[in-house]
């Protein structure tokens, strides 16, 4: 693989050819078989992974030949049963073929991405969750509408093959991919003609399909944004384990009016702000209501013509920033005007200017979170804490760890929001529910549990919040802490409760369109 990368750097044209012979490299399937064993060792007993199941490379060659014939004599997905006792050897060969196919396709894809970021000194790689917080902290002086779009994830297999065909010249190497995609579609329970490319099964193959599909979607969007806003954007490549995103460069340029000696300094700030996490993307644009409607109509139509798929109307929602409050990414998002008084003194004259900028004001959805906690049996509908009876069979440490994990994820994810006082109500519900769960387990009362454990009860749970919200030394520092927002970079994903609440909001929008 390293040699292939080196040759591809010397001649970027040959990387699109001669991919098919790589499918018959024995080292490739040895690597893919090791990856399969490493991924399954955590969920399967070790006795089923003994050395008696020898890996035969001849069987893999025969498997590839059957895929090329397309006679449906081999079934890759139906026989991939999670039960290790049911035809496990056939499942291992199928997974090895998928791993090998993914490894071959990743090589030109990664080289292509490497060329797109070459020469960029300030390029950095972030996970997609970390691109949300700079977007929420960004100023929106030239935007008055926001569009919340969900990327369609149901797509025809042939469209996926065509996206690979645009940058891979070796057509025979795509025949196994086409056969596998069609077989996966035929083996699924639904009778639809499309397949789901969202990686519900966390495999290397489906992660690669999803990242490549999102890469194509955003590459189209970038070209449109460049033409509409005349902004200079840097397109960052997407490696198989990373997420494609875009970072704008802001600079100042000088232009002059006709028939005038005055020069005007203008800020070359793009009128379109973009961020994506998972299947959701947010675009903040400037324009009238008619212009926003044109954008809302043009972008889905362009994507439909490019990918030959239909977008449901409820997947694109537009809101006016100054009037409406939208829900996205687990927040209630609204805009607020932030006035700034600027005083400039030149000789004896004093100029005063008022600058007004718009910024996001993310709000914690307290009532929906309490509703989700009641659904998970942490409290009732009114928010009164109750014991988690399903956890009484666990140890005390496991119970404390689980409550600690829930509160830590909630507090870290919403720590940068304004008006965090509602989070302390969530803290009260979780802490009292934890105490009631321990009391129910030991068949005692909350008072006895608090008396026996004392400060050790919540030594691990809810301790991070004390460190972050420690009282400052001065009132000026206290006022500053209320104005500033602190985002924690150790958030791996959207909070599960926020994700569930967002699904409920999406279902409400879908029901409105169905009526």
Curated annotation (Swiss-Prot):
Q: Which family does it belong to?
A: Belongs to the intron maturase 2 family. MatK subfamily.
* Identification of the protein by name: Maturase K
Recall the GO molecular function terms of this protein's record.
RNA binding
Q: Which GO terms describe its cellular component?
A: chloroplast
Top-level lineage group: Eukaryota
Going by the UniProt record, its keywords in alphabetical order are:
Chloroplast, mRNA processing, Plastid, RNA-binding, tRNA processing
Name of the coding gene: matK
> InterPro entries recorded for this chain?
Domain_X, Maturase_MatK, Maturase_MatK_N
Pfam (any one): MatK_N
Instruction: Give the UniProt subcellular location, in the record's own words.
Output: Plastid, Chloroplast
Q: What is an annotated GO biological process for this record, any one? A: mRNA processing
* Location, primary (coarse class): plastid
Name the job this protein performs.
Usually encoded in the trnK tRNA gene intron. Probably assists in splicing its own and other chloroplast group II introns.
